[in-house]
């Protein structure tokens, strides 16, 4: 029999746990204003906590992003939800990123939502490029076949 040491979770600050996560995490209020971001979110969005907490999600994420409607739905339903393969674009960083976005209401708060962003892997990006390349080859093949038929 082994003697397991059980850690007293009350002694661990929640902020330290959130800061230790490698994925970007944000806490939003009911108006989608940013209340907290962890270090990974600061790196992801290219801005500090003090800059980000002066903004709302609408300021940070491109207009019409499914992330905004995801957060609205989580607030309305009081239930966690996930969006997969979302394009995360912003004027703050140049390239669009593909990510899975997890949002959950924070219990015992008035409409606050925790949002975790998990960027998709390089393999997904390569897969998309291969699909595009295959489509381009199909179009090129079709064009050469039509040119041959017209010639005959």
Model-identified regions with their sequence ranges:
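Sensory modules in modular signal-transduction proteins
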Residues: 2-50, 140
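Sensory coupling linkers of modular signal transduction proteins
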Residues: 105-146
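Hydrophobic pocket-lining residues within nucleotide cofactor-binding pockets
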Residues: 21, 28, 57, 106, ...
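Helical H-box/DHp helix segment flanking the catalytic phospho-acceptor histidine
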Residues: 148-152
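Terminal output helix/cap of sensory domains in signal transduction proteins
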Residues: 9-15, 44, 49-100
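A generic fold-level signal
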Residues: 20, 29, 52, 96-98, ...
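Short, charged amphipathic alpha-helical "coupling" segments at sensory-output junctions
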Residues: 1-14, 123, 127-135
């Amino acid at each position: 029999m082994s003697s397991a040491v059980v850690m007293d979770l009350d002694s661990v600050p929640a902020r330290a746990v959130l800061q230790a996560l490698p994925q970007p995490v944000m806490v939003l209020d009911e108006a989608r204003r940013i209340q907290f971001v962890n270090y990974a979110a600061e790196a992801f969005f290219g801005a500090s906590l003090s800059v980000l907490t002066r903004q709302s999600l609408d300021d940070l994420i491109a207009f019409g992003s499914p992330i905004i409607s995801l957060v609205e739905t989580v607030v309305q339903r009081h239930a966690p939800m996930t969006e997969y393969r979302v394009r995360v674009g912003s004027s703050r960083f140049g390239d669009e990123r593909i990510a899975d976005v997890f949002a959950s209401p924070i219990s015992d708060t008035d409409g606050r939502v925790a949002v975790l962003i998990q960027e998709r892997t390089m393999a997904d990006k390569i897969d998309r490029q291969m699909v595009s390349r295959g489509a381009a080859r199909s179009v090129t093949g079709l064009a050469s076949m039509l040119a041959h038929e017209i010639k005959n």
